[in-house]
């Protein structure tokens, strides 16, 4: 680990000492985890002002709904029963606390350092965080993409609309409970002279099963 990276980490940790934040250096990268999602805007504003993180390079999210679950059973049980077969799992789509994590990538050109700031959204009933588009204009479209793909809402966003999917699209494609086939398919209807949307007829199945070996 470089002493310069450690120096940046120590200085930023001191700046954030008054908040519920945990930091670490792993694989040559600095990461800070915010405990309370209500502090996201205030913490990022402080980082921009006091450590000159003038660029927000990305905002993204992770859905941990199926984290640690395997499509095939492996291990000692396999020798007795054989492999289980890949099949579409029925996930519980009810609200799950800590299911989503939002991630911000920041760059300080003045200090020549990048950091990652992330936060688990603990309240599954309210998947809402404050927008940081007032701090960085680049957050505008990035937050729209996170909303479109994951269904995470951003409070005080100036124009929170879908940005990647079509008008009237149902669901959020990067959620783990979103079917790989989607919900509808489209085709051109010669009689109507336009594109029509119909319920998808493809069976949703697992072609490449996820296997977790302990």
Curated annotation (Swiss-Prot):
Q: How does it assemble?
A: NDH-1 is composed of 14 different subunits. Subunits NuoB, C, D, E, F, and G constitute the peripheral sector of the complex.
Q: Which GO terms describe its cellular component?
A: plasma membrane
The record's subcellular location field reads: Cell inner membrane
Originating species:
Francisella tularensis subsp. novicida (strain U112)
SUPFAM superfamilies recorded: Nqo5-like
Question: rRNA-binding as a keyword?
Answer: no
The task this protein performs is described as: NDH-1 shuttles electrons from NADH, via FMN and iron-sulfur (Fe-S) centers, to quinones in the respiratory chain. The immediate electron acceptor for the enzyme in this species is believed to be ubiquinone. Couples the redox reaction to proton translocation (for every two electrons transferred, four hydrogen ions are translocated across the cytoplasmic membrane), and thus conserves the redox energy in a proton gradient.
Output one GO MF annotation: NADH:ubiquinone reductase (non-electrogenic) activity
Catalytic activity entry: a quinone + NADH + 5 H(+)(in) = a quinol + NAD(+) + 4 H(+)(out)
What is the similarity comment for this entry? Belongs to the complex I 30 kDa subunit family.
Q: Which UniProt keywords apply?
A: Cell inner membrane, Cell membrane, Membrane, NAD, Quinone, Translocase, Transport, Ubiquinone
Q: What name has this protein been given in UniProt?
A: NADH-quinone oxidoreductase subunit C
Topology class, membrane: Peripheral membrane protein
- PROSITE patterns for the chain: COMPLEX1_30K
**Matching InterPro entries:** NADH_DH_suC, NADH_quin_OxRdtase_su_C/D-like, NADH_UbQ_OxRdtase_30kDa_su, NADH_UbQ_OxRdtase_CS
EC no.? 7.1.1.-
């Amino acid at each position: 680990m470089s002493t310069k990276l450690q120096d940046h980490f120590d200085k930023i940790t001191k700046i954030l000492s008054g908040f519920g934040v945990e930091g670490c250096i792993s694989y040559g990268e600095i990461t800070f985890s915010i405990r309370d999602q209500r502090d996201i805007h205030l913490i990022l504003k402080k980082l921009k002002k006091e450590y000159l993180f003038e660029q927000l390079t990305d905002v993204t999210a992770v859905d941990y709904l199926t984290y640690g679950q395997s499509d095939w059973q492996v291990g000692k049980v396999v020798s007795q029963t054989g492999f289980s077969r890949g099949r579409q799992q029925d996930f519980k789509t009810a609200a799950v606390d800590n299911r989503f994590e939002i991630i911000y990538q920041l760059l300080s050109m003045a200090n020549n350092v990048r950091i990652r700031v992330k936060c688990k959204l603990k309240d599954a009933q309210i998947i809402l965080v404050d927008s940081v588009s007032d701090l960085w204009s680049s957050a505008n479209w990035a937050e729209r993409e996170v909303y479109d793909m994951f269904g995470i809402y951003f409070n005080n966003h100036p124009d929170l609309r879908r940005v990647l999917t079509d008008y009237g699209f149902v669901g959020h494609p990067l959620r783990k409970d979103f079917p790989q086939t989607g919900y509808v398919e489209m085709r051109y209807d010669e009689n109507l002279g336009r594109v029509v949307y119909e319920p998808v007829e493809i069976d949703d199945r697992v072609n490449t099963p996820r296997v977790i070996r302990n």
